[in-house]
A protein has these predicted regions:
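Short beta-strand->loop
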Residues: 7-9, 100-102, 119-146, 160-164, ...
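Extracellular/periplasmic juxtamembrane helices and adjacent flexible linkers that interface
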Residues: 227-307
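Periplasmic-binding protein-like
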Residues: 90-95, 157-161, 167-169, 200-233, ...
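N-terminal segment of the mature folded domain
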Residues: 1-128, 267, 271, 305
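Stable alpha-helical elements in mature extracytoplasmic
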Residues: 11-15, 19, 47, 56, ...
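Short helix-loop capping/hinge motifs at secondary-structure junctions, enriched
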Residues: 103-109, 128, 141-149, 226-234
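Ligand-binding pocket segment of bilobal, Venus flytrap-like solute-binding proteins
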Residues: 145-211
């Protein structure tokens, strides 16, 4: 049996559980070899750091390109990884939405409602969670749409984050805080987490699609050094390639992620609000720049959160 390890971010557990079974069956049928995939999940930034520190991942499927770039800087992932797989190595996308309790008691309709007095917001910590970085940028995109003055944008972000009562280390922890522990009035969430919550707890929650959000592009890569050492390069490549097949893209849609295959995305037209205006990471100058400006030590997040 060939074993490979996929180090992934927080809310992808259920998707990869199903996908791994699908891939293992396909591999057995096509190559007549047994393969077993081991999963690891947590906040994307923490997961990237664990690979840098020696966690033996063959592949990484993380929340944002920046997390894989961190691993690339150590030489574990080959330069140019982003061109190795289609669509800039992003086999699925998502966006950021607001999840509220049934009946929307606090009347939350858009990002500015999250800055009102008495609104309790739940969102994870961008220092450890990739989803939290997308959450921050989605809100900042709204602020940029409203004001060109950076001080006004910062003031808006400061008011929003002043209302955050619990900041978990990962997106799944934030969902647990909101759903299981009943804390907060609104959860800033991955669209796929919000959809999954709606399916599991029918009738208890509502999704609010804000006027502006962000195209979240989780990235995938082979951890080349580890895969070479483990003799798993070929399986690792096929594992990530298989994400782009019609069969896998359909599973992606069923799991609440947006398939990058346009035809398959259309099949799920009712699941997703495709009318939300989506900023992209390029509107923020790409990840390197966005990370420096917003999430590095003493950058914008620290400035507005620790004031």
């Amino acid at each position: 049996v060939i074993t490979i390890t996929n180090v992934s971010y927080d809310p992808t557990r259920e998707f990869y559980e199903s996908y791994n079974t699908m891939f293992e069956e396909y591999y057995k049928k096509t190559y007549n070899k047994e393969v077993q995939v081991i999963q690891s999940h947590g906040g994307s930034g923490s997961q990237a750091r664990s690979v840098v520190e020696g966690c033996n991942a063959d592949v990484v499927t993380l929340a944002l390109e920046h997390d894989i770039s961190l691993i690339e800087k150590t030489g574990l992932v080959d330069a140019g990884w982003i061109k190795e797989f289609p669509k800039s190595s992003a086999p699925y996308t998502s966006t950021i939405v607001l999840l509220v309790r049934k009946g929307n008691p606090k009347q939350i309709h858009d990002w500015d409602d999250l800055t009102r007095k008495g609104v309790d917001v739940i969102t994870p910590d961008p220092k450890s969670s990739g989803g939290a970085c997308w959450n921050f940028l989605a809100a900042l995109g709204y602020a940029k749409t409203k004001w060109s003055d950076e001080n006004k944008q910062k003031e808006f972000m400061r008011r929003l984050y002043h209302n955050v009562s619990v900041m978990d280390s990962g997106a799944r922890g934030a969902t647990t805080t909101f759903v299981e522990n009943g804390k907060g009035d609104v959860l800033i969430a991955w669209e796929n987490e919000a959809i999954a919550t709606m399916k599991s707890y029918g009738g208890k929650y509502e999704i609010v699609n804000p006027s502006v959000s962000i195209l979240a592009q989780p990235s995938v890569a082979i951890v080349d050094d580890n895969a070479k050492a483990n003799g798993s390069e070929e399986v690792s490549k096929r594992y990530l390639d298989f994400l782009y097949t019609k069969q896998a893209q359909r599973l992606i849609g069923k799991s609440g992620y947006r398939p990058t295959d346009k035809e398959i995305l259309q099949e799920f037209g009712n699941e997703f609000d495709l009318s939300i205006k989506l900023w992209t990471i390029d509107d923020f100058g790409g990840w390197e720049k966005a990370y420096q400006k917003c999430f590095d030590d003493d950058a914008m997040f620290d400035e507005i959160y620790n004031y």
